[in-house]
Amino acid sequence: MRLLILALLGICSLTAYIVEGVGSEVSDKRTCVSLTTQRLPVSRIKTYTITEGSLRAVIFITKRGLKVCADPQATWVRDVVRSMDRKSNTRNNMIQTKPTGTQQSTNTAVTLTG
């Protein structure tokens, strides 16, 4: 009997875990509730994302892992985003550039006749 009750309790718990938010709106974990007006130094920012929704915002993720929401229309926010994009483009260009000039073939196959 105890095993049956324990099994039913486990099934109910599992069902509640799997079916989260049925009949209700599940909020997005990337939603901002307020925006900061305090400038963040570019050197402390690791990356950013832009959210759309009831409150449009730029979410800066600092090198320490903190998430800071800022107004995308603010001048300092646009400057930081531009700076981050420039860094990203520079990094991507360095990765994608191919060396110029000719390289010697690495094919070392030898044909023996005889």
Swiss-Prot record:
It comes from the Eukaryota. It holds the Pfam family IL8. Its main location: secreted. It is found in: Secreted. Residues 1-21 form the signal peptide. Disulfide bonds join C32-C69. SMART domains: SCY (SM00199). Highest level in spleen, lower in peripheral leukocytes and very low levels in lung, colon and small intestine. InterPro entries: Chemokine_b/g/d (IPR039809), Chemokine_IL8-like_dom (IPR001811), Chemokine_XCL1/XCL2 (IPR008105), Interleukin_8-like_sf (IPR036048). One of its GO terms (molecular function) is protein homodimerization activity. Residues 91-114 are annotated as: Disordered. One of its GO terms (cellular component) is extracellular space. Keywords: Chemotaxis, Cytokine, Disulfide bond, Secreted, Signal. GO terms for biological process: antimicrobial humoral immune response mediated by antimicrobial peptide; cell chemotaxis; cell-cell signaling; cellular response to interleukin-4; cellular response to transforming growth factor beta stimulus; chemokine-mediated signaling pathway; inflammatory response; mature natural killer cell chemotaxis. CDD domains: Chemokine_C. Chemotactic activity for lymphocytes but not for monocytes or neutrophils. In thymus, mediates medullary accumulation of thymic dendritic cells and contributes to regulatoy T cell development, playing a role in self-tolerance establishment. Belongs to the intercrine gamma family. This is Lymphotactin. It comes from Homo sapiens (Human).
